A protein has these predicted regions:
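Short glycine-centered segments of the SAM/dcSAM-binding site in methyltransferase folds
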Residues: 42, 137-139
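Conserved class I S-adenosyl-L-methionine
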Residues: 1-38, 40-49
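SAM-dependent methyltransferase
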Residues: 141-210
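A short acidic, Gly/Pro-enriched loop at the edge of an enzyme's catalytic core
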Residues: 100-108
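A short glycine-rich, Lys/Arg-flanked "PGG" loop and its adjoining helix->strand segment in the class I
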Residues: 124-136
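Class I SAM-dependent methyltransferase SAM/SAH-binding core
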Residues: 52-97
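Core SAM-dependent methyltransferase catalytic element
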Residues: 216, 223-235
Length: 235
């Protein structure tokens, strides 16, 4: 998520980022990403959530830094790391502004459809920061939900009741704006009667590849159950 988005709704759903869900997701993605991992690699997990993937990567013998803007998720990540004896480093920061360094990472990953929180005009900033942080030939693994599927589901106002960390949450899809390729989503937590509105941006594979090819070479795209996982190599 970016600094102009309210953080609270992401913390409300912290239970969806914790170990069990993370383990189920890892089972799906690891067969496709293990070719890009080797012991001793330095890895950065961008928009890492509660850190289940970050910690898993550290347990494969890599040195991992996880970055996320939501303080509640980073707190959960640190707790889980202590519980599992992991040495993964977690930083609460905006991935669009946090200094990642230059040429220090062997691999960058960004899972959980996190890019939908990036305004389209900010994506080149994200791309360039990852490019600078990677070593020559370093891969970026990017996982996302196809935006057209999301538009089809959310093009009409509707409500979905979901279970958050401590209460039920009503997620209401308000409207889709075809000009900005974004839609408004309202989150309402029943236990505290709090409401936040966020903007989610639509990305599709061809658009992502068009934005990425300026500095990265597209390698492959893998269809998962509800999303796609693309691999790009730093030119």
């Amino acid at each position: 998520m970016t600094q102009d988005q309210p953080i609270a709704p992401f913390d409300w759903f912290a239970n969806q980022f914790t170990s069990k869900r993370g383990e189920e997701f890892i089972e799906k993605i690891y067969p496709y990403m293990k070719a890009y991992l080797k012991p001793g690699d330095r890895v950065v997990d961008l928009c890492c959530g509660a850190g289940s993937i970050t910690i898993f990567l550290e347990e494969q013998g890599t040195q991992v830094t996880g970055i996320d803007l939501a303080p509640g998720l980073i707190a959960l990540a640190r707790q889980e790391a202590v519980k599992r004896g992991a040495k993964a480093n977690f930083i609460q920061a905006n991935v669009l502004t946090y200094p990642l360094g230059e040429g220090i990472y062997d691999l960058a990953v960004c899972f959980g459809n996190a890019i939908c929180d990036f305004p389209h005009q900010s994506f080149p900033q994200f791309r360039d920061r990852v490019f600078d942080a990677l070593k020559p030939g370093g891969p970026l693994i990017l996982e996302y939900i196809d935006g057209l599927r999301r538009v089809a589901f959310m093009s009409e106002p509707k409500e979905v009741v979901e279970q958050g960390l401590d209460s039920q949450i009503v997620r209401r899809f308000i409207e889709y704006n075809p000009v900005s390729s974004a839609f408004k989503v309202e989150y309402h937590r029943l236990s505290t009667n709090e409401t936040y509105e966020v903007t989610e941006y639509v990305y599709i594979g061809p658009l992502i590849r068009l934005l990425m090819e300026v500095r990265f070479e597209f390698v492959q795209s893998t269809r998962l159950e509800h999303s796609f996982m693309d691999v790009y190599i730093k030119r």
